[in-house]
Amino acid sequence: MSKRAFNFCAGPAALPTAVLQRAQAEMLDWQGKGLSVMEMSHRSDEYVAIASQAEQDLRDLLAVPNDYKVLFLQGGASQQFAEIPLNLLPEDGVADYVETGIWSKKAIEEARRYGAINVAASAKSYDYFAIPGQNDWQLSKNAAYVHYCSNETIGGLQFDWVPQTGDIPLVVDMSSDILSRPIDVSQFGLIYAGAQKNIGPSGLVVVIVREDLLGRARSSCPTMLDYKISADNGSMYNTPATYSWYLSGLVFQWLKEQGGVEAMERINRAKKDLLYKAIDGSDFYSNPIAHNARSWMNVPFRLADEKLDKAFLAGADERGLLNLKGHRSVGGMRASIYNAVGLDAVEALVAYMAEFEKEHA
């Protein structure tokens, strides 16, 4: 096999090589059954065992309490932007949202289709370079829930704290930082995460929801979007994204083998420290995000002269450092350094950055 490139894509993102190799080995013949997982009936004993093991491994990794349901659904995180208010927001109620970037803004825009939304705080006043402290939030007294995005993949803005909302359910989009470090699931009413960053391939979204929040869907909520129906049917009301679920299960097993999310936190800290040190120690590269809001997973940076962007990307591609172009709405560069992107990838990137700066500064 030729050497695999270092993939810094924001999503669909890098998967652990060991996971891909195992999937390759099992592609035509899963554990002697003579067929691929993608050919299995989702009702078969074999697939039900695969799905159950994946759920248990995720529960183990995040220490999910027993009074939470873990759902493996379709539609990605973007579908959750509608599914959450349809399940949790009464027609005459209000929900609080915190806007810190493009993804939380999209969640707000979608939720407004279904009811009253109060934007309790916005990072717009900081040009999306910092997160407003909770003392500055304008929370509703009787909100159905409070929603925020823990890590904005495009802007590179991440909460390093968990909002405190008392008895009001806290809902969080963790699509891009779930499993990157330990969390206390009991602090949240609902956690959701699109799979294609830190969980597995696209086509899947994981929802972790406290049981007392089930059964609240509006009468107009489509059957397929009702959390209780999904929970009562083991995420198999219809045919699920079986292969994505299976591959995500392999990622969970790999994470356990690495030492779990505690080990991931140590590695991820080393990766982000190395990259930010290279950026901050240079007059050639810059990152404008407030230090206490810098993302561990998505690191945007700019070159001193944007006319050099194409040359930088071309040189990176030649060295197997792929997908470093920033989002079209932001520009510049972005290195997404999820769990499957090793420290060696960041070391190679930092070495190239130094080489490029020496040549062009």
UniProtKB/Swiss-Prot annotation:
Cofactor annotation remark: Binds 1 pyridoxal phosphate per subunit.
Top-level lineage group: Bacteria
Bridged cysteine pairs (disulfide): none
Positions of L-glutamate binding: R43
Any Pfam family: Aminotran_5
GO cellular component, one term: cytoplasm
CDD domains: PSAT_like
Catalytic activity as recorded in UniProt: O-phospho-L-serine + 2-oxoglutarate = 3-phosphooxypyruvate + L-glutamate; 4-(phosphooxy)-L-threonine + 2-oxoglutarate = (R)-3-hydroxy-2-oxo-4-phosphooxybutanoate + L-glutamate
Alphabetical UniProt keywords: Amino-acid biosynthesis, Aminotransferase, Cytoplasm, Pyridoxal phosphate, Pyridoxine biosynthesis, Serine biosynthesis, Transferase
EC numbers on record: 2.6.1.52
Gene3D superfamilies, alphabetized: Aspartate Aminotransferase, domain 1, Type I PLP-dependent aspartate aminotransferase-like (Major domain)
Function according to Swiss-Prot or TrEMBL: Catalyzes the reversible conversion of 3-phosphohydroxypyruvate to phosphoserine and of 3-hydroxy-2-oxo-4-phosphonooxybutanoate to phosphohydroxythreonine.
Database matches in NCBIfam families: PRK05355.1, serC_1
Family: Belongs to the class-V pyridoxal-phosphate-dependent aminotransferase family. SerC subfamily.
Subunit structure: Homodimer.
Name assigned to this protein: Phosphoserine aminotransferase
Organism: Ectopseudomonas mendocina (strain ymp) (Pseudomonas mendocina)
